[in-house]
From Swiss-Prot:
GTP binds at residues 104-111, 184-188, 242-245. This is Signal recognition particle 54 kDa protein. Gene3D superfamilies: P-loop containing nucleotide triphosphate hydrolases (3.40.50.300), Signal recognition particle SRP54, nucleotide-binding domain (1.20.120.140), Signal recognition particle, SRP54 subunit, M-domain (1.10.260.30). Involved in targeting and insertion of nascent membrane proteins into the cytoplasmic membrane. Binds to the hydrophobic signal sequence of the ribosome-nascent chain (RNC) as it emerges from the ribosomes. The SRP-RNC complex is then targeted to the cytoplasmic membrane where it interacts with the SRP receptor FtsY. Its EC number is 3.6.5.4. It comes from the Archaea. Composed of three domains: the N-terminal N domain, which is responsible for interactions with the ribosome, the central G domain, which binds GTP, and the C-terminal M domain, which binds the RNA and the signal sequence of the RNC.
Length: 440
């Protein structure tokens, strides 16, 4: 999950608010203290935290809740709005031909982000390529070349040429028929005069439409100083924050964004190309506060899945064979890690907390199910009712799994089939379930 530790702490503070008997000044102060502690532990700038805390207190005690909203919901709404104020709106990313220059500290994930960014645009239907203009770090050329080939995006580089400005010039000419041209520059300390000068010369040659600064989520308070230096040099138009998955604090990077007023363009939440997301502030805050991000989940599903993957019409009519389940498991794999998918669900719709061990065990079990189904016949996959004792033994032997594992799979399939029939019959009221869980 994105900034898991901060999310857990903020959700804990909101649960205290939801569970309070009445919303008075004492309750608000306690909740604000918990929020303060969570943000400071995540390395968010003290000045930003204190300013936000004061505004939450004042608004919670003075503002009247809007019509149809109770005091608890009103305070949660205020917290949401004030967090939005710190982070700001995401950068506007237009799907049109453009040149992008990548800058940032060495080790921030800049080269990997350059390739993932190209892949992002390619998934949107634009022809994208990268220019390897990092001549400072050994291995940078080969890293970007390998990533570009793996992701099937265009690449230009000149191995052995130390002149980054010349490479940029030649690369942009070589990729002139591409819609998106991304220049990967050398990672540097923002106060190194010679490297800053090179960056400015590349900027003059490339004339980029966007200058994206890449920040490691764990950089801490020094992020602000670095961000200001880069901004003063080339004028940052957007920020990419990497390594926001897991326990990364991320507050320093978010503070830097707030201070420089450069909007966040993308966030990296994992190692695969699919773990690179266009930043949407409202969705980001919703996930932090445990409200889920169903819009991103639907977009991820649309990008990853084809009509062949899931036969929605058949499912809603209650027809759910083992073949359908097999396709469903493959489709889930395309969407990314289970933990990331679950983080997009609100608390009460499956977005409850699981340990890493539980996520791993579930993922392993899903893989095991696929192995078992690979040992079944076409008839068995279409109509599991024909699978009796002798067939279970054969499937068990063929898959290398136990008979108990095969029976467990059949039981899981039956449960899924029953659940789908329930949804078809309208037995589940999701909104009612959420209200009950959240105590609203």
């Amino acid at each position: 999950m994105v900034m898991e530790k901060l999310g857990d702490s903020l959700q804990g503070a909101l649960k205290k608010l939801i569970g309070a008997g009445r919303i008075d000044e004492r309750t608000v102060n306690e909740v604000v203290k918990d929020i303060q502690r969570a943000l400071l532990q995540a390395d968010v700038n003290v000045k930003l935290v204190m300013g936000m805390s004061q505004r939450i207190k004042e608004r919670a005690m003075k503002e009247e809740p809007p019509a149809g909203m109770n005091p608890r919901e009103h305070v949660i709404r205020i917290v949401y709005q004030e967090l939005m104020e710190i982070i700001g709106k995401g950068a506007e990313i237009q799907l049109k031909p453009q040149t992008i220059m990548m800058v940032g500290l060495q080790g921030s994930g800049k080269t990997t982000s350059a390739a993932k960014l190209a892949r992002y645009f390619q998934r949107k239907g634009l022809k994208a390529g990268v220019v390897a203009a990092d001549t400072f770090r050994p291995g940078a050329y080969h890293q970007l070349k390998t990533l570009a080939e793996k992701l099937n995006v265009g690449f230009y580089g000149e191995e052995g040429n130390p002149d980054a400005v010349e490479i940029t010039k030649n690369g942009l000419k070589a990729l002139e028929k591409y819609d998106i041209r991304i220049v990967d520059t050398a990672g540097r300390h923002a106060l190194e005069a010679d490297l800053i000068e090179e960056m400015e010369r590349i900027h003059a040659v490339a004339k980029p439409d966007h200058k994206f600064m890449v920040l490691d989520a764990g950089i801490g308070q020094q992020a602000s100083q670095q961000a200001h230096a880069f901004n003063d040099s080339v004028g940052i138009t957007g920020v990419i924050i990497t390594k926001l998955d897991g326990t990364a604090k991320g507050g320093g990077a978010l503070s830097a964004v707030s201070e420089t007023k450069a909007p966040i363009a993308f966030i990296g939440v994992g190692e695969t190309p699919e773990d690179f997301e266009k930043f949407e502030a409202d969705r980001f805050i919703s996930r932090l506060l445990g409200m889920g991000d169903l819009k991103s989940l639907m977009e991820k599903a649309e990008e990853s899945l084809s009509e062949e993957d899931v036969n929605v019409e058949a499912l809603m009519q209650g027809r759910f064979t083992l073949k359908d389940m097999y396709k469903q498991l493959e489709a889930m794999n395309k969407m990314g890690p289970l933990k990331q998918i679950m983080s997009m669900l609100p608390m009460g719709m499956g977005g409850m907390k699981f340990s890493d061990e539980m996520f791993q065990a579930t993922s392993d079990k899903m893989k095991n199910y696929k192995v078992i189904m690979d040992s079944m016949t076409e008839e068995e996959m279409t109509d599991p009712r024909v699978i009796g004792g002798s067939r279970i033994k054969r499937i068990s032997k063929g898959s290398g799994c136990s008979s108990e594992d095969v029976r467990e799979l059949l039981k899981y399939h039956k449960t899924m089939q029953t659940a789908l029939k329930g949804f078809r019959g309208g037995k589940f009221n999701i909104q009612k379930m959420m209200k009950k869980k959240m105590g609203m």
